[in-house]
Structure formats: C-alpha cells, structure tokens
Amino acid sequence: MPSVSNISVGANFASNFAHKARHEMNASIMRLSSGNRTIMGGDAAGASVGNNLMARGKSHYMAARNAEDGISALLTAEAIANEIASLAYRLRELGVQADNDSLLSANDELALDKEAALIGDTLQDIEVASKFNGQTLIATGSDTTFKIGTEIDGVTAATTITTFDAFTDATEGIANASGADATADLLLADVAITLGHIAAGISSLKARQNIAYATSANLEAAAARIMDTDFAKETANLTKFSVLNQSAMAMVAQANQAQSAVLAVLQ
C-alpha cells in the first residue's frame, strides 16, 4: 500500500468513531443521571405514550383526592345532621311537656316557649351557617355535586348526590312549645333521609376513590416501564462506549504516527 501524506485517512476514520462513541457515552450518562431512557432520542414514541399515561395517572390520583374531599364534606354533614337530631329530641320533649299544661304555671309555659323558640332559631342558623370550606352544606332543596372523574375528550365525569332534603319549613314558625313534638317528628324524618343519603354518598365516593387510586397506580407503573432507565443495560452501554472511545483515540494517535513515517522517508 502506498504511503500518502496529503490526508490522514486512518486518523479521520478513528476520529469519527471516537466522536460517535463520545455521543453514546453522553447519552448513557444523561439517561443514568435522569432515570429517563427516552431522552437523547432514545425512544420518541415511548416518550409520547409514557407522558400520556403519566398525565392520566396523575389525573386519576387527583380524582381520588377530590373524592376524599367529598367524603370529608359528607362526614361534616353527618355531624351536623346528628346535632340537628339532638335538638329535635329536646324539641319533642318540650312539646310533650307543654301538652301537660293543666299542671304548668304561666311561668313554666313561658320558659318552655322560650326554649322551643330558641331551638327553632338555632335550627335556622345551622341551615344557613353550616359550611365546608366556604360551601353551604344545608340549603333548601340543595344537591351537592362531587366531580371525582378525570377529563377525557373534554368531558368530566361527575356524580351528583342529594345530601340533604329540605328541612321542614315548620322550624321557621316555632314560637312556643305547643305542638313542638310534631315539628320534631318532621325534623327527625328529614334527618333519617339525610343520613341515608350521606351513607350512600360516602360508600359511592369510597368505591370511586379506590378505583381512582388503583387506576392511577397502574397507569403510572405502565409509564415507568416505558420511560424508566434500564440501569443494567445503560451501565453496560456506558462501559462499552467508554472503551470504544479510548480505543478510537488511541487509533487516532497511531494513525498520526503512521503519517510521520512518510516524512522520515524524505530525511
């Protein structure tokens, strides 16, 4: 083979291979340090699928958190309903006691009437003032809607649960103890219906929450299987291309030394 001095063919080839090896080394270093195998052009299609799965997984997790907020609201409503029931118990006692008016003095009847009226005012205050995070829990004919689904194609899944029936308007007219026992019975009937709605709502939300948590975990696991770095494989690649880079650089030096032999002929 003739010696030519105008171009170092071997050195150029070796330099090119060294460049490729360094590129692959850098890619392996980035994948190992980031934990993401799809970067540096590793898998564009996988990145697209993985990102979509991860986004949906996180959305389902947030849906589960929304369900938890709904459960908290319903538990608050349950406590309010039970307190209303306690007031209804006392209201019924007052009504029954007031029925025995033949043995009550005028002052006794006045005391009973004042307590009954105060309970009526308290019930009205509870209806208006009972809130969860600023949202009214008890209002006439109110339905509470909990959005616990995920947005798919622009549609958000939701569930509407009637948490409270309208508490009887009779509470607005409680001015005395007479007949308060009948009003208490109406209140207790509403409380019973309300507690049934609450229990059903909590069961529904817990079921949806469990599904949302499970879906989130599986979607994020699927995304991880696509996008996460295979550390064993990538470490082997880093070692391989590190050796190739060192070998190529050594060959560049060897090729350059071979070219110097041409000059030796001229001396």
Report the location of each language-model feature.
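Amphipathic alpha-helical coiled-coil/heptad-repeat segments
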Residues: 1-23, 27, 31-58, 64-216, ...
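Surface-exposed loop/turn positions within long extracellular repeat scaffolds
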Residues: 106, 231-237
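Short aromatic-acidic-glycine turn motif
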Residues: 219
